[in-house]
């Protein structure tokens, strides 16, 4: 090897070595505008792209903790874990899928429920975790939802649920479909007793979740451009063999057609929910009267 080859080789090796020292996860590409973003900046911005304002998927536990007053969160039914009652197997065993999802997310299932305060108002909050098997709804999700709703009823406080789900969990078959009726029944009980329920639909909210609890809020809110519907647009197009309208099943389309009540930016969600909770429970607003956005 000549002296110049040795220098060039050493330079290339040094360059390659320096590249390999960049820790994984430092940069994230926006799924909308494809800009490369600094992950820490994106985290500070609550997973909203600072370039195009695209609302990326948001970790369920982080979402709830950022909503509640610091130090006020108490988890509800944290001990519940899914069971493979049917010994279900598709390409993989269900129990193996559960183990992999639990290892990946650090959560026991696709749903987290908490009690805490929002601007010192006691509330119950819940969120689907899309990273856990697509946020699918099984028996544990249904059970935790019911426990959270019962807590809200017992304390006579608002219940807020963030949806991000592909629908019912196929590996639990009929047990998962039963959760649609189970969650709808407890919400009917809440409505009968005057308990406020606010549903926040995030991207995506589909299948059995959209056909049950997600659309049963006293107020239904969506994040911008969230995909909301029963079947996905590709499935519908293949079935009807027609091109769907522009923006079909997106939050803006649903708002225009009266299926949801409002669209709220993630950065404004906490204050908006606080105003709504105060209004719905006849409590003093946590803000100045002039800042209220709810019309009489």
Curated annotation (Swiss-Prot):
Zinc finger regions, C4-type: 30-52
A GO molecular function held by the record: ATP binding
Record key words, sorted: ATP-binding, Cytoplasm, Fatty acid biosynthesis, Fatty acid metabolism, Lipid biosynthesis, Lipid metabolism, Metal-binding, Nucleotide-binding, Transferase, Zinc, Zinc-finger
Positions of the CoA carboxyltransferase N-terminal domain: 26-295
Similarity annotation: Belongs to the AccD/PCCB family.
Purpose: Component of the acetyl coenzyme A carboxylase (ACC) complex. Biotin carboxylase (BC) catalyzes the carboxylation of biotin on its carrier protein (BCCP) and then the CO(2) group is transferred by the transcarboxylase to acetyl-CoA to form malonyl-CoA.
Protein name, UniProt field: Acetyl-coenzyme A carboxylase carboxyl transferase subunit beta
Species this protein is from: Haemophilus ducreyi (strain 35000HP / ATCC 700724)
Gene name of this polypeptide: accD
């Amino acid at each position: 090897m000549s002296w110049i080859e040795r220098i060039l080789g050493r330079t290339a090796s040094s360059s390659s070595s320096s590249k390999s020292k960049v820790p994984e996860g430092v940069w994230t590409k926006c799924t909308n505008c494809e800009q490369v973003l600094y992950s820490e900046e994106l985290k500070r911005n609550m997973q909203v792209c600072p370039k195009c304002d695209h609302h990326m998927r948001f970790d369920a536990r982080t979402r709830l903790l950022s909503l509640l007053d610091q130090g006020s969160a108490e988890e509800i039914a944290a001990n519940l874990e899914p069971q493979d009652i049917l010994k279900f197997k598709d390409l993989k065993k269900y129990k193996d899928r559960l183990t992999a999802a639990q290892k990946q997310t650090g959560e026991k299932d696709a749903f987290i429920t908490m009690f805490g305060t929002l601007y010192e108002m006691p509330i119950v909050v819940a969120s689907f975790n899309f990273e856990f098997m697509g946020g699918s709804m099984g028996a544990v999700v249904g059970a935790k939802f019911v426990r959270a709703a019962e807590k809200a009823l017992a304390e006579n406080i608002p219940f807020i649920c963030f949806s991000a789900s592909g629908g019912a969990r196929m590996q639990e078959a009929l047990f998962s479909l039963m959760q649609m009726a189970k969650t709808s029944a407890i919400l009917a009980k809440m409505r009968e007793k005057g308990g406020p329920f606010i549903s926040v639909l995030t991207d995506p909210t589909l299948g059995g979740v959209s056909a049950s609890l997600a659309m049963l809020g006293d107020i239904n809110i969506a994040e911008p451009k969230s995909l909301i519907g029963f079947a996905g647009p590709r499935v519908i197009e293949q079935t009807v063999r027609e091109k769907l309208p522009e923006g079909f099943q997106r939050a803006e389309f649903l708002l225009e057609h009266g299926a949801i009540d409002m669209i709220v930016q993630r950065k404004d969600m906490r204050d908006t929910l606080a105003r709504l909770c105060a209004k719905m429970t006849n409590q003093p607003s946590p803000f100045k009267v002039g800042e209220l956005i709810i019309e009489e």
